[in-house]
Amino acid sequence: MARKPTLSPSRITTFLACPSKYLWTYVDPRGKWYLRAKSYYSFGTTLHKVLERFHDEGDQGVTTVGDALRIYEESWIDAGFASAEEMQEAYGEGKEIVQSVVNDAIAKREEGVKTLAVEKLLKADLGPFELIGRVDRLDERADGTIEIIDYKSGRSSVTESQVRDDLAMACYQLLAKRLFPDRAVMATIHALRVNEKASASLSPHDLEVFEADIKQIGQTILSASVDDYSPRPKPLCEGCDFLALCKKDPRFE
């Protein structure tokens, strides 16, 4: 039996933003030769690794700010930076973020809050495809509410409405609700640069409507034809790894 296709928030948002980028990222293997290392990805991956270790209740080796800074140094990724100076500036900024976030987490640790998982892969069968999503952290709050925490290393602010309107956060809530059907579920984005958080929760009706929308979008992605992937100029073309590929297509005009 053939495996059911899988779609993730990143795949879905990529297709909605640019079907051509989806093609080169996930469908046509030629695209991988055009991918370049990104400094923001290296920076974010490093911070995620530190917080994964710190919040993993099974990892007793990272419990203090000093431990977290040690893991930061060990985990640092230097790929994608334009110069050594740019990398050093980012390294210093990341170190300050780790100190601030971990200090705050230790000082404000809430009674009754338990981390259930870090870097947890959630799945749900949505009929023609399987929806998957990897959450940075999954907490159980004192009242039994399941909280999904998503770290954002590039944001300088975050609001409740942004969390509510975020496709990935809605996907995570849908997936978490499948795993914990009798629990309330909430989503939180943690903007690491400013150490600020915002949370939102979709109602059962909102989740039902969202699930129907995602199924429809998924069907569109899975049934996409060659013409659907036709490259068309748009603002996000500037700086895209695949611009050279799209320019080779006579339809790109």
Where are these regions (language model features)?
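Active-site-adjacent bridging/hinge elements
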Residues: P19-V27, A142-D150, K215
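Short acidic (Asp/Glu) and glycine-rich catalytic loops that position anionic groups and cofactors
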Residues: W24-G31, H48-K49, E74, I149-S153, ...
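C-terminal, charged and often intrinsically disordered regions of DNA end-processing helicases
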Residues: M1-Y41
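Non-catalytic protein-protein interaction segments used by genome-maintenance enzymes to assemble
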Residues: A117-A176
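Metal-dependent nuclease catalytic regions and adjoining charged, substrate-binding loops involved
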Residues: T6-L7, D143, L174-E253
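A non-catalytic, helix-rich entry segment at domain boundaries
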Residues: K49-E119
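Hydrophobic (often cysteine-bearing) scaffold residues that line and stabilize catalytic clefts
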Residues: S39, F43, L47, A90, ...
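Short, polar/flexible loop-turn hinges at active-site or ligand-entry regions and domain interfaces
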Residues: R30-K38, E57-V62, S83, V158-T159, ...
